[in-house]
Amino acid sequence: MKKLYPILFIVIINFSFAQTKQFIYDYIYVPDSTQKNVTESEIMVLNINKEKSEYFTYDRYFSDSTMLSGSKKGLFMMPPNKKMSSDRVNKTSNSNQIKFITQLGFTKYFVDENIDLKWKLYPEYITVLNYKAHKATTEFGGRKWTAWFAKDIPFQDGPYKFKGLPGLIVKIEDESKSHKFELKGIKNTNYDFEYPNLNNYSKINLDYPKFIKAYKNYRKDPAADLVGRYMDQTDSSGNFRRGVDIFREEQKREEEKIQKDNNIIEINLIK
């Protein structure tokens, strides 16, 4: 069952650069290739202004904003106990350079990438949110993709790292139907957007080849950042627990989680 989110979906006709345009996408994906009938979904946001665009998960943004607001008031707040993507993508207008931001363990990676997608255009079209959307295909991240872009929405941008078509990408899906983004709403915002910076993590700046190595190392040992973080303690029932035993339990959980997360959007990272 799809989740409902407290976002007002409004279609705006005026696409001048007077304001930041906010495009809301539904992202549906299959996390485990051995269970193709099990899907998960997230609401993704793409903010576009004259100079740049920023893409992120709505739930993560809401959580980070709430935690930042609490910290300014001296309150310690924990993020909700739910699965949320940490992926963010910042693109610069008229450039192939992007900044991909993601978190692995307790480390946040700021990855510099050069994205130059090769698109093939077709005469077919469909309608998405009353916009005529034309067909295009490309290959990216080890997958073949079919996209639909609207020339009447004059932004050469799209969800995640997708870009470079003569109109906004309003729908895109990979050949295996494991990952699909579809535009669900458009609205104007009257403020300069800035993603909340919590500063509660280690930060590493690197290029994409070095990130590939870091990502592969993380999947081999997803609990590496947890080493030394658990002290001996007494639980709520009064039972003594060694820190090393707690760590091993967490290590097992992280390894099981990684095994089930085997159908990532950039599948080439694990092949």
Indicate residue ranges for each PLM-predicted region:
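Short, hydrophobic/aromatic-rich segments at coil-to-beta transitions
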Residues: 20-22, 129-136, 164-171
